[in-house]
Amino acid sequence: MAEVTVNELATSIGAPVERLLKQMQEAGLQHKTASAKVSDEEKQRLLAYLKGSHGEAAVEPRKITLQRKTTTTIKTGTGNAKKTVNVEVRKKRTYVKREDDVVDNTQAAQSQEQDDELASTVVEEVQQAEPSVVPVVDVAPEPEPEPVVEEVDVAAEEAEPVEAAVDTSAPTRFSFTDGIEEKRRAAIERRQAEEAARQAELKAIEEAKRAAEEAKRTQPRAEKPADKSAAAGKGAKPDNRQPAKGKQAPVAVPVEREDAKHGHGHKKHHHGRNDDDFDDDSADRGNKRGAGKAVKKAAAPKKSSKIDLLDFVGDDSEDSDVLARRSHIRAHHKKNNKHAFKKPTTQIVHEIDIPETIAVSELAQRLTIKVGELIKRLMKMGVMASMNEQIDQDTAVLIVEELGHKANLVSENDIEHALEKSLETAGELTTRAPVVTVMGHVDHGKTSLLDYIREAKVAAGEAGGITQHIGAYRVTTSRGEITFLDTPGHAAFTAMRARGAKATDVVILVVAADDGVMPQTEEAIMHARAAEVPIVVAINKCDKPSADPDRVTNELVAKGVIPEAYGGDTQFVQVSAHTGQGIDELLEAISLQAEVLELTAVTNAAAKGVVIEARVDKGRGTVATVLVQQGTLKQGDLILAGQSYGRVRAMVNERGEQVKEAGPSTPVEILGLDMPPSAGDDFVVLDDERKAREVAAFRAEKERKEKLARFQAAKLENMFSNMEAGQKKTLTVVIKADVRGSLEAIQASLADIGNDEVQVNVISSGIGGITENDVNLAVTSGAIIVGFNVRADGATRRLAETEGVDIRYYSIIYQLLDEVKAALSGMLDPERVETIVGIANVREVFNSPKFGQVAGCMVVEGTVYRNKPIRVLRDNVVIFTGELESLRRFKDDVNEVRNGFECGIGVKNYDVKVGDQIEVYEVKEVARQL
């Protein structure tokens, strides 16, 4: 709290500035003006001084109780009858520290003189107050000392306001006598006096009533007239005044106050007993115990009586001051004492996230209600579900809105979208090296070309060459670096395309000059086109005598690959892997293509990339080859790749060297993943391991569900379920044949099958057995594989079973065409055909109490069936279409009535007339044929 001035402090506490300055000087503070600053420490000193002056500084206990317990044994009896008895003695003593102990001798002497004067004054007041309770004693049959003592106590109570008034006029111990506190003290004293007077008046009324009842009860036993009873009452008056003359009344006062000090209250009837009770008890008991107590009280010393009385008076005044101060504090803090908690009066609305499916127990937990109550609400909606069953999103939304909460629809892919949004990289873009994939037929020199590039550009001058198993490496040219990916079988490339990742920037298509375009070459062209990646054609083996580059160029033109010399956009380079002819030109063409693409990446950001391949090495664990596309991958980063995650424990480059970080377009091997990721999976760097674990688990569950749903995705019978309504349906096929002639014949025949609604789309065709590449391509495009006189090997069959791809084998071309045509026919919408099965004429109409109007009919054609739809014709015009409600023959329900028989027909929700025709028909769906 900031410092305040003396004037501000006086205003806040409601005291005059002059008195506050005087008190501060008495407390030892050096403040003389109203503008002087007062710190928090000085406020505490002033408060401590004021508390000390008011007698509140000492907070130590003023009463102590000591307890002692001793156990002894005594022997009782004589002779053989002796026995030992344990005797336990318990003693308890209480010591009370008086206020007078802290007063010095001088003040004690002065207080003694004042006490004597006050005692005499109080005794006189007590003697004067005695006549107010005379009617109470007047009805007593026998005067006794005990009632006299109690009457003196009542008079002392009435004299309490006088004592308080006398005490306030005397000099007090407090040095802080503010006008406000004096007014409050006076008000408290006035209220106490009024309360005492009211209690005395009520007590007098009650005593008068009780005396009247006692007089009525004792009147039959009276032996003297009423004046004699009055004389007896007069005779009791001197007895009542006798204890006052002997100054025994002050002895009774501290007895009552001693009870008050021990917690019995300031009111005499606090425990349910009053003076009349004591009078009755003493009258019944006689002069035995009551007289003894009166004698003991009368025998008390005079001086101690006066001291006890003054102690009582001082305590009362001190209690009044304490009450005044407490009331002042309560009034000062009344506004700040409000409870901070407010009971909510409006309904609390929660926002509930609802996924596509949610368990009943989980929804109840989010709604903060009991599961039983939620199940009751579901039953009211017609949904029978237990606490562990899943309900759909729409039902959960209805429940949430019915309870008055807000529902937030959550998609299953929200976690992926949130992850992508949190991984958005922003920074300065820099030029990166191109990523090149070499593809082609295995016999066309692809491996020799890669070996020559590595030996000439990477391993020249290094002992041992490079590590072959990494499958990726970088080459430095005059125009920069180039990253090569070696992906045998192109499995990773297909997986990348399936996930929409463009890990490859340029494809080098290797074609042998002496062999021409082969099926694998066509497959590579289709892969490149599917990924929308530019192609650079490398015509290899140009050093051979049988090389014919022109023939290769013409064959590629026939496949849609147009060279720049023919007006296309594809670069053609003639190379030789043995002599090195055209290698530099090939690298130059790649660099030129990269410049056209303007490849850039962010360097100073979290790393992103793609997994090229993964394996498990003994002693090293999971080893994954990754290609960094964005950012910088560092050792120790937490990466998430598909369903696997972990920290990078080590990184190895293409030379087998340990590296600490890898930038964009850099392939490295990493160690530390918990399981091998799939080839083509994207990887990202995260900061939160818990989030990585959650995303990995979500992806694993999602893949499991997709595999369950994918078993029907590629089946011929369910192919139409994947097509969108209103669009031309397509049957996607991958064809493999034994010879090129058969393949061309099959392609031409399939192209002729189809119409405006369905068609066949051949995405890939080739010669030879069915390979894993074909299966991967079919998985990506949702196609079926057709093999003509070819088969799939064991690994391919296992992959097809795992991915749920349908492979069909044929040896006769007509069977292949018929099944494809049947599949296309199954994709066509069926045709609905109506057939009339029976006609009945209405000849009479009857009224039935159960069915209403019933038509008596004669079946004139076909058969009338009970459960088939009908039409009612009147004058050969259809006036009603519906169904039969009942069909009877001779009061018996029947399912059908044949031609020439009579029957009763009840038409549901319609009235028929005589002469109408009832036409029974059925609707059949007829499959359409191409």
From Swiss-Prot:
GTP binds at residues 440-447, 486-490, 540-543. Residues 160-179, 208-301 are annotated as: Disordered. GO terms for cellular component: cytosol. GO terms for molecular function: GTP binding; GTPase activity; translation initiation factor activity. This is Translation initiation factor IF-2. One of the essential components for the initiation of protein synthesis. Protects formylmethionyl-tRNA from spontaneous hydrolysis and promotes its binding to the 30S ribosomal subunits. Also involved in the hydrolysis of GTP during the formation of the 70S ribosomal complex. It comes from Cellvibrio japonicus (strain Ueda107). Residues 263-272, 288-301 have a biased composition (Basic residues).
